[in-house]
Amino acid sequence: MASDNALPSAAPLISVVVPVRNEAPNIAPLIAEIRAALVGVVHEIVYVDDGSTDATPQELAAARAVGAPLRILRHRASCGQSAAVITGVKAARGEWIATLDGDGQNDPADIPRLLARAQAEAVKGVPVLIAGHRVNRRDSTVKRFSSRFANRFRAWMLRDATPDSGCGLKVFSRALFLSLPHFDHMHRFLPALTLRAGGVVISEPVNHRPRVRGKSNYGTLDRLAVSFLDLIGVAWLQRRGKRPVIEPEA
């Protein structure tokens, strides 16, 4: 087994993909938590810096210099969270992918449990997405209310049976993700896209923590406006997707 202090020489079981933009104060603490959560698991950590203008690149370089199993990818200019996730998953070497936000609000300690559930479901032969569900959210009242409204409206439109599609903590196979359509803001619709592809979505309760360092790079109204437009597009995709049942060759 590879050392926890270096990238594994063989393909890791899981790649933890973390998209970040201007999260310098959260880099070192979150990487330490990811490493602690995955002790004994062959893993890599893939950070995608989405055009940060603060000290995020320097903090990432410092973390790698002290031995973190870390890969660093960088967008020259900000392209958005979904683009960063896509970049990270494409570069990842693990069979399984865990995504989480870079602000420290998702708890890496939940990753092993979600991974175990994904592996247990995978033996059934159907692609699976394990989606985190932030049961006790530690956000402002405005953010909680807007998220609740958006989740209910999305569930009504897409029938994705997911109470918290916006949770950044998810576990899925790399193969599943690469088979999905890729577009801006797709990370918000992974459950619906997985169902459209014939997969299964399972929501698991996860810990959620208040942001203690830095500030959000996205405004609530901006998220709502963008999500509504994308929602229409995903609904369009759903209604035009067909999965034929192919009979055995004669």
Spans of features found by a protein language model:
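Terminal low-complexity segments of carbohydrate-biosynthetic enzymes
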Residues: 3-6, 229-250
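Cell-envelope/extracellular polymer assembly enzymes that use nucleotide-activated donors
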Residues: 13-15, 44
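Short, well-formed alpha-helical segments that are part of the catalytic scaffolds
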Residues: 23-37
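Donor nucleotide-sugar binding loop of glycosyltransferases
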Residues: 23-26, 52, 81, 107
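Conserved donor nucleotide-binding strand/loop of the catalytic core
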Residues: 43-46, 57-91
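A conserved acidic beta->alpha catalytic loop
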Residues: 49-58, 104
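Acceptor/aglycone-binding surface of glycosyltransferases and processive sugar-polymer synthases
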Residues: 73-91, 96-99, 105-185, 193, ...
